[in-house]
């Protein structure tokens, strides 16, 4: 027979701690400076900001104001901030009063202190300051019925005493009546469990980083832990875990208190449930049934029972937390009360909770022996990246947004701030910025929906930073999912049927596209996907839904996501001998769903290669990008600006509509003329028109405008044209070296040949040239340079352009004008400088 373990007495006086908790709740007042510091540091998770504002205005105790709102049914959660307790302890220390280390005690035994705080709150709960109808809640109805029953019991007891001549009707009630009243009141207080009458959920908020640094005792680490670092000595303690949420169950009702009704005496019997399993009561335990020796049968009263929202989540280690050669570990999280639905799959979070064991029950207990499962009972959640929809547009956020606008050139600055360590690719970064902002969703009266999300495909040679751009977008986007084509199946992208471990029901587990709802799904190695898996994306890219019919489940899931795909051409590298469609090797049905398709070619160029090599070597040497001519915008500020821009819903005026229609007709005609050429990209489809509209709306959002301007449409057309022109190489090498001035001259000369006259309207020239993606500065330089060469002149106060030789010149003269850079050196130099200073980055045709 084994000897008993020695008993020890812990030096913990819980009565003294309970008195300190009561004093803290009643007397604590938060100073303005500390509350502002806490709000600035924890701006994302300020759940009780309204209560802080209220008590600061009233200059009263913070938690008593919070309890008053609980009593008035305006608040259903009480958040105990450990920063406030630490401030309370410091104030007691400065006053010369020795107080126990309450913060350390809560961190080491959080589960027990939850009950202590609840008892202190119950004892100090104020009366409601507004009238509350007893019909509002089921518990109010039960309490009201119990109060009426007690009054009847008192009346019956009074009549019984009078009938027994124990008192005279003219005399005051004797002590027996007071004793009977006291017994009835005590029975009422003992009848209802404390957990049944509580109308709030209590949570602990961990120490902030500033307070944790100043905290003298480091018994519990305030830094977030990985799942691998959680050991057995953390059981019962308040810890913080950092990871990514991989699975979230449905919200189910979890029973806390079960109410039974006896069929003999009519009494209510309550049973508290503190575990996952329980044994229902069957026999009545009331005093009346015991005295009458009648075994009344209990029937469960579901309406009088108390249920709370329950959700089970699974958190997994981040990739940087996993050692070499290991697989990520995971931990179950139990979420109760008002914290449910605060976690979503794919979120990177810091979850503060109580680390508790869950012993095996049933047959598992016989096999597992002393082993137990562990879980984290969530107390507080801090999101690393807030969703765009959950951004609170406070005055501080608006001030930072306006500061960014006043700095000027927001469009180019934000685009350059996307992965500044990656050299060049400014137009690609501009398209990715518009993808982050998105267009405007439209819903027609008959229910048809027009998507506003923008889809972009990056196709190019290996080593041009496609994957790095994808990961940069995932980092900036609050809800970004990164996956690869070969490592993803159709089920992994859409949804899979699996068994719920909580309820053992068949449920749908969302894939990458569902997890990226209201976000961005980045798919790398898009060309390596199987054709059967790639077809699952067709519905998502246009209809933004996923239709599922499997395992008896017929439903439609939302996948309101933007697709950012990266792919390599056929045979790995771009082959200039093949047409662009052959190089791209994607079906036309999928190709037309992309608003922009960039081809990023790795073309040898001495100047570009030298700049790229210098950039890469500098990054390797200093672990940062070279000094830029601007200050990159931080990802957090960029998210705030994009969230602010997403609140705008710009519309198009009649003039802009006509301009878009004419531009689309010209695109269709150009694609029709190029259909027979070797370098044809394909037919321009109506989806191209919708893509131009979405890009224009995104540009208007970036300007924080309510109307789409013609300049927005022109920039969208320029991006579309640049993306189209980058899909093929010109066979004539000399055309690649043409300056913008020469290209504009070619366009005007072609217009002259089509009209057959020697004059052109300056307004038509401006419209055509800007439609081709050139700026007014470049057009002005072109007209000035060729006027100096006596090729044309502006007449009629600048409204008409007239050719000197009736537009007819021989081939030798034309070639000399186009290819002679030495004429008018000052004008040419000024044109080149102006082109470099232009906001629009031109690509070679």
From Swiss-Prot:
Query: Could you tell me which SUPFAM superfamilies the record lists for this protein?
Result: Nucleic acid-binding proteins, P-loop containing nucleoside triphosphate hydrolases
Single annotated GO MF: ATP binding
Q: Where is the MCM domain?
A: 410-617
Residues engaged in binding ATP 2: 593, 687
Q: Which residues are recorded as modified (Phosphoserine)? A: 819, 838
Q: Motif Arginine finger — list its residue ranges.
A: 592-595
Q: What class of enzyme is it?
A: hydrolase
Instruction: Kindly state the subunit structure of this protein.
Output: Component of the MCM2-7 complex. The complex forms a toroidal hexameric ring with the proposed subunit order MCM2-MCM6-MCM4-MCM7-MCM3-MCM5; loaded onto DNA, forms a head-head double hexamer. Interacts with CSM1 and MCM10.
Other notes: Present with 166 molecules/cell in log phase SD medium. Early fractionation of eukaryotic MCM proteins yielded a variety of dimeric, trimeric and tetrameric complexes with unclear biological significance. Specifically a MCM467 subcomplex is shown to have in vitro helicase activity which is inhibited by the MCM2 subunit. The MCM2-7 hexamer is the proposed physiological active complex.
Please report which protein family the annotation says this sequence is part of: Belongs to the MCM family.
Descriptive protein name: DNA replication licensing factor MCM7
Species assigned in the record = Saccharomyces cerevisiae (strain ATCC 204508 / S288c) (Baker's yeast)
